[in-house]
């Protein structure tokens, strides 16, 4: 008997998703555990594994389809030796939960305005109503070149004018070379927004419109941190996979500071403020389609080596679109680090419903005054963005002071555990 493949629910709140890509085609043999498709939710693109064994007999929902309801019939498997003759009847009987064709968006297409192949023939008319057959690109080049296109003889099928005809037209090549070298005929390209980009836009717009942000900045001397990091990494020898990053120390310092200042580990609710009992830290990670924030849970209870290893694993999964909902949903505080891009400081946008996000800038050598003497130190800028409904200025300042103490004296946070 044919086996139904249904649109899976990849999180408790998921009601629909996009079928981004089929990794198998009709006629392919499927084994349990094989990845057969990629489903795009409002948070991430996730792989779907087969549960049953069989042959992919019919793909019902094509790749690129959007807004496919959960539990819709997306494909059908048949068992070994089973005939295809009754497959259409089976689909007709079992496709009642599937969305109607008009309810599912067509696969997203890449739109490139004015970037039309020369084979696409269009008809143009001049002021004297003389019909001219030319490709859109040829017409645009003729306009840039300031040449009357009806004066150009076409060499394409049925006498149509193509790009090369415009380029080789007498008096045209020189003018064109002077004008088009520094300007692309296609003014722009359009990239359809995927679900990840849409949800980022929605949440950040909501944050800036509804959350009263305020910002606190501080400078941290990271010379001791860099020294102790170097000593730790030397102990790993040539094992680069075990190396501790500056960001690992930042995560641990934030965790210890939240342990000391729990009022910064909170979120706003209309009826009550939630003060979190666990220190779960979201870390912003750039991916091809946008941004995700995997979570280090109970970060205050972990040593620097374990925390670093866990963070590396989460980053790898994030960039491979393999994070599970439990690994990126929740969290009480976010860290966004742009220091590796040379950004000195920035004001990050709060990730609702959290009340705080800390933007970390680059480290650089600067002159400082110490004991009335000018000396050189490695300084890192950090900026706390906080929700003033939850975090008062004094609480934000207290948190940054605790963070600064841990980051400037890293031995404290390496020893300071519950």
Curated annotation (Swiss-Prot):
PROSITE patterns for the chain: BIOTINYL_LIPOYL, LIPOYL, PSBD
Residue ranges of every copy of the Peripheral subunit-binding (PSBD) domain listed in the record = 133-170
CDD domains, per this entry?
lipoyl_domain
Which residues are the active-site ones? 388
- The EC number on file is 2.3.1.12
Free-text comment on the cofactor: Binds 1 lipoyl cofactor covalently.
Subunit details: Forms a 24-polypeptide structural core with octahedral symmetry.
Task: State the protein's purpose.
Answer: The pyruvate dehydrogenase complex catalyzes the overall conversion of pyruvate to acetyl-CoA and CO(2). It contains multiple copies of three enzymatic components: pyruvate dehydrogenase (E1), dihydrolipoamide acetyltransferase (E2) and lipoamide dehydrogenase (E3).
Q: Family, per the entry?
A: Belongs to the 2-oxoacid dehydrogenase family.
In Swiss-Prot or TrEMBL terms, this protein is called Dihydrolipoyllysine-residue acetyltransferase component of pyruvate dehydrogenase complex
Q: What is the lineage of its organism?
A: Bacteria, Pseudomonadati, Pseudomonadota, Alphaproteobacteria, Rickettsiales
